[in-house]
């Protein structure tokens, strides 16, 4: 598992799973196609949590006379690796087709305006600069049978020293853990809906 390769030891973890009535290939394709912006629209609580977390950063930009970065019209999991750090960007730690994808982030998440560190995948596991937390989200598919798939989302966070551990624990116990759970559950639910949606019939040959 990519999770164990990059973060075998961690402070907190959360996991979500949902059963999808579709095969692994269809479910994986849906996971890669799901629009994260659309998840916020389909699941209002997910959208509200995202907007709430982004608010301090927006205010900070405005106070400095800067325009906040424009929100993308659409955003898929692989797109996160192309975004700048601090503007929604994540590090793609690894992807195994039709199996799992893992994304990582390093920062002081407990601050109203998060201080990020841009840490490449090959340095992610060893990163130990004091005062930071490292988070991984891993999403995976596992066959149940030929026509159904278990879709999973697992989050792990590790801190780099005692001070960061204390700060992160306070942040986590304020309800951030529940919020993270809701966000991933929303992503999995919309992925399931996409995977289970009937395939439109191919147009037949023209006649006449």
Residues covered by each model-derived region:
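Acidic, Ser/Thr-rich low-complexity intrinsically disordered segments
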Residues: 204-208
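Hydrophobic-ligand binding "helix-grip"
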Residues: 82-146
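Intrinsic-disorder/low-complexity, polar/charged segments enriched in Ser/Thr/Lys/Arg/Asp/Glu/Gln
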Residues: 11-19, 100, 134-136, 148-152
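A short, polar/proline- and glycine-enriched secondary-structure boundary/capping micro-motif
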Residues: 39-40, 112-116, 162-166
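Beta-strand/loop substructures that line and gate deep hydrophobic ligand-binding cavities in soluble
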Residues: 122-178
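Hydrophobic ligand-binding cavity/cleft-lining segments
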Residues: 1-90
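A conserved amphipathic terminal alpha-helix motif
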Residues: 167-203
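Short, solvent-exposed loop/turn segments at secondary-structure junctions
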Residues: 25, 36, 107-110, 156-158
């Amino acid at each position: 598992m990519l999770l164990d390769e990059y973060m075998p030891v961690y402070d907190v973890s959360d996991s979500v799973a949902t059963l999808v009535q579709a095969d692994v290939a269809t479910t994986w394709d849906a996971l890669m196609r799901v629009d994260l912006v659309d998840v916020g629209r389909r699941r209002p609580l997910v959208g509200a949590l995202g907007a709430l977390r982004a608010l301090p950063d927006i205010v900070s930009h405005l106070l400095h006379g800067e325009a906040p970065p424009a929100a993308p019209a659409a955003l898929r999991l692989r797109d996160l690796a192309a975004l700048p750090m601090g503007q929604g960007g994540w590090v793609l730690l690894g992807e195994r087709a039709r199996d799992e994808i893992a994304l990582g982030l390093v920062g002081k998440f407990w601050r109203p305006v998060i201080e990020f560190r841009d840490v490449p995948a090959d340095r992610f596991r060893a990163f130990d600069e004091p005062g930071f937390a490292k988070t991984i989200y891993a999403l995976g598919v596992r066959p149940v049978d030929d026509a159904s798939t278990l879709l999973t989302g697992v989050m792990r966070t590790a801190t780099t020293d005692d001070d960061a551990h204390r700060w992160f624990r306070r942040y986590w116990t304020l309800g951030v853990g529940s919020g993270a759970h809701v966000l991933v559950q929303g992503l999995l639910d919309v992925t399931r809906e996409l995977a289970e949606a009937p395939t439109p019939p191919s147009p037949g040959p023209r006649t006449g």
